């Protein structure tokens, strides 16, 4: 197999139309900016043989606004690349070089990388963001029963293995920075899900994870779990 593919979408409208209607309602959308998706499949394909795959996604200074909603996306820029070797001759990875979202009183900047993707993923993630969930709820046409609100401020850097999280071995998590949640809530009445939080978290994790937490209120409820702090 030696295949190269490329999809050029003229705007975010094409991308948003790929999102299942169970998540976003179909509604008139005005969008600008370019979206490019390209990659390759190379190598042997057959019994106990799988080709290598690459993927590169680029969104360049895109903007969008749904009709009849007060807020829109002023600027969305993102670049993502990935490589997967199913035969594991070479290490696989996923690399988010940049994700930048501006609009609706929200400014999100993030980057991250996952190495050893098919083994024990080694995760690195950094974000510096101010998120107004109340305004975002007036940016996207959420389905009936889904509601979000409050504010989230995040400025932290994370490094850990996936197995560390699965084993809840928090001492091996490298996490440094802060996470603030003010009157935050996520609800989906159709799925009987609710999460609310009013908390300020500070993390110090150069060698071992340490944290200072001021949790004024936190609750999680769904069909299987009910917890309050």
Regions found by a protein language model. Give the residues of each.
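Membrane-proximal interfacial segments on either side of biological membranes
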Residues: 1-95, 106-214, 228-229
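Short beta-strand segments that buttress and anchor functional surface loops
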Residues: 96-103, 214-220
């Amino acid at each position: 197999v030696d295949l190269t593919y490329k999809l050029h979408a003229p705007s975010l409208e094409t991308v948003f139309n790929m999102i299942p209607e169970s998540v976003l309602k179909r509604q008139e959308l005005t969008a600008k900016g370019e979206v490019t998706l390209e990659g390759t499949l190379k190598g042997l394909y057959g019994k106990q043989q799988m080709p290598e795959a690459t993927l590169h996604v680029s969104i360049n200074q895109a903007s969008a606004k749904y009709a009849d909603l007060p807020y829109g996306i002023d600027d969305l820029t993102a670049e993502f690349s990935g490589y997967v070797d199913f035969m594991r001759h070479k290490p696989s990875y996923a690399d988010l070089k940049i994700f930048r979202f501006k609009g609706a009183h929200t400014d999100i900047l993030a980057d991250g990388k996952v190495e050893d993707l098919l083994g024990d993923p080694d995760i690195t993630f950094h974000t510096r963001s101010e998120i107004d969930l109340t305004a975002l709820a007036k940016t996207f046409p959420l389905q009936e029963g889904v509601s979000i609100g409050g504010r989230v401020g995040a400025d932290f850097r994370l490094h850990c293995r996936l197995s560390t999280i699965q084993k809840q071995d928090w001492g091996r998590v490298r996490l440094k920075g802060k996470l603030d949640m003010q009157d935050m809530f996520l609800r989906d009445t159709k799925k009987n899900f609710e999460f609310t939080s009013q908390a300020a978290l500070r993390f110090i994790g150069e060698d071992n994870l340490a944290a200072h937490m001021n949790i004024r209120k936190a609750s999680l409820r769904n069909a299987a779990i009910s917890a309050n702090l």
